[in-house]
Amino acid sequence: MAEALVDFHCHLDLFPDFEELVRECDAAGLYTLAVTTTPRAWRRNHNLASATRHVRAALGLHPQLVADHGDEIALFEALLPETRYVGEVGLDAGPARFRSLERQREVFRRVLVACASAGDKVLSVHSVRAATLVLDMVEAHLPRGRSNVVLHWFSGSKAEARRAVD
């Protein structure tokens, strides 16, 4: 059995040599999910990744950017049919982002509803200091079997981790 390496959450487009990194990941056989932070960044990532065997682009709206880019949720919803992969999305209730938490919740709810409607999505979900809230929202808006969720930046308890696995 051949071994394969997977990086399920990498912000390749935040590096100055983004295009070269995509080529290097592909040449090395490193399966990479290139998550985006805004829907406007997705097209460039998708175009580069679609020319590779090992790199895929994910459509995202990062919770840390929702205060300034939350209006891009309509663009997110419009682009969603073009991809199976979604990330980075979620909630960040850390001190620096707590003021935008209600807006984050609304955006994340719309992401989950859109993914539930489309089905067969794979989500990379940011969950800083918000594990219970993230799990509550996933359970409420993304019925089991409609998509798969991987928690990223999980800072929850053991009980929350068990709940996520169950």
Model-flagged regions — what are they?
Residues 1-166:
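Mid-domain alpha/beta scaffold segments of enzyme catalytic cores
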